Amino acid sequence: MTTMSDLSPDLVGEILTRVPMTSLISVRCTCKMWNALSKEGIFFKAARKQFMGFTMMDSRVCSMKFDLQGIRNNEHDFVDPCIKQIAKLDQIEVSKVLQCDGLLLCVGKDNSRLLVWNPYLGQTRFIKPRKRFNKLEWYALGYDNNHNYKILMNYDTGHLFGYEIYDFSSDSWRVLDVSPDCHIPFHQQSVSLNGNTYFLAQEKIIVEGEEEEVVDEIEKFLLCFDFTTERFGPRLPLPFHSDVLETVAISCVRDDQLAVLYQRFETWEIWVTTKIDPTAVSWSMFLSVDMEPPTGCQFDDEAGSFFIDEENKVAVFFNSDLFNPRVENRNRRYPTAYIIGQDGYFKSATLREAPDLVKPDPYVYCCPLVWSSYAPSLVQL
């Protein structure tokens, strides 16, 4: 009689690609061989075959899994309809979720506390900010060359502006004396790569005799915060020129590359980095599509998100649409997934119906994907 211990490593790896990532910790306990294979990285290789992400709905964190096999078949539904709320995180209402190498940083809705979660190990850690400011705070999660994790916080009350950093090893906050010569909007997305965080930033204009003024029409660029030096790097150029009417957003590719989206009307471009570090970047075109006839799809660079599938040469976008043609209620927002391919391939699917809103709010019921191709982390919290 064949037992689980008799299965080959290759077959085990295939089995693991079909296991929900949040259940892998239970699978590790199945037998000694599977536990040993996890330590050798088999779990991590299998994990990268999945397109799994975490999303936020109604201030709760949910896991999402996507099957992109056979997407060119019109009968194939590319989105797994199962979206599972993470019961372990029900203890906190979340306003934003960030990730770094398999760890999630959940920002409390009232900014009074932070929660770090390792989905693979099932461990959590609450962190209380040193001070409570307002909703214009933003956070970033990363680590230094010694793999010591840290959290960067920026606050801007209109009267007070500054940075603080939390060190996991000392369990303490301290003021950070940095001041980048540019503006990082609090609503902009950030991406963690190799322990550092990359932001979309824009120039900050100082008008004589008046307070600082930000001019929205100027170019955007990348800015990296290095968690080893605890300093911002130089401005890193994007592979295109953009203005205020055009959409720019960033995402990660397998946690070792960065992807940038550029949308101008019905033209969509996605570029990926061929080299990136805190001081230099180079780019290569991944996808360029002119959507004819027009689809009417406008990516929300504040609430939307995306990831790319290199094997199928497609990009999957997640948006929170105010209008759904099947239900003409403009007081609702509908989390929607779009898939776009090189040859004009286009599909869309509403992930769920949002509750009524008293007043339409572009920041409510948004559905930002945190990351895909999730790789588990063995970092202890």
UniProtKB/Swiss-Prot annotation:
Ranges for domain F-box: 1-47
Entries under InterPro entries matching the protein: F-box-assoc_dom_typ1, F-box-assoc_interact_dom, F-box-like_dom_sf, F-box_dom, Gal_Oxase/kelch_b-propeller, SCF_F-box_component
Disulphide bonds in the chain: none
A Pfam short name: FBA_1
Top-rank lineage group of the source organism: Eukaryota
Descriptive protein name: Putative F-box protein At4g17200
Organism: Arabidopsis thaliana (Mouse-ear cress)
